[in-house]
């Protein structure tokens, strides 16, 4: 999913650094609201991965809880979550059909084996081939009730004139990975409203 941001935001972001772009993206309420709606629209166990805990992960989890609390179990996992609690969540999700895990890339891209992940949402842009493939690998585990994995790779189009923004370039790198791995994918442009 390629999110085209409003023109006034693009104008403000056109000369910003990578760090400033990531700050804008991770704290953008409209973007996070879109992600929370996407989570609510999916069936099956959903893993939402984000990079910044305080800036994005926690506020995004709160939005998801507000939207989904009536019919889904929602778990927040990041570096400070004790190993025993992570294992409890893993066990609960294996037994659940419609749970949501909101986690940091660092805690869930490697070393966690949950077979019943039906959807993965990359809520933060990432470029590392190893981390991208390891994150996708969380959902490629075989489970009896799962025929496919839906990956929602959220990218942000803040390009101005002929200049692509940093995170859109990173999306291009992830597309190269998807092509190398021969994944089926579709790029869907979406216009964010203010």
Which residue stretches match the model-derived regions?
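Conserved RecA-like helicase motor-core motifs
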Residues: 47, 65-87
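Short, conserved beta-strand edge motifs with alternating hydrophobic and charged residues
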Residues: 2-4, 47-51, 75-79, 101-104
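Short, flexible loop segments at the rims of nucleotide/cofactor-binding pockets, characterized by
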Residues: 22-28, 76-80, 98
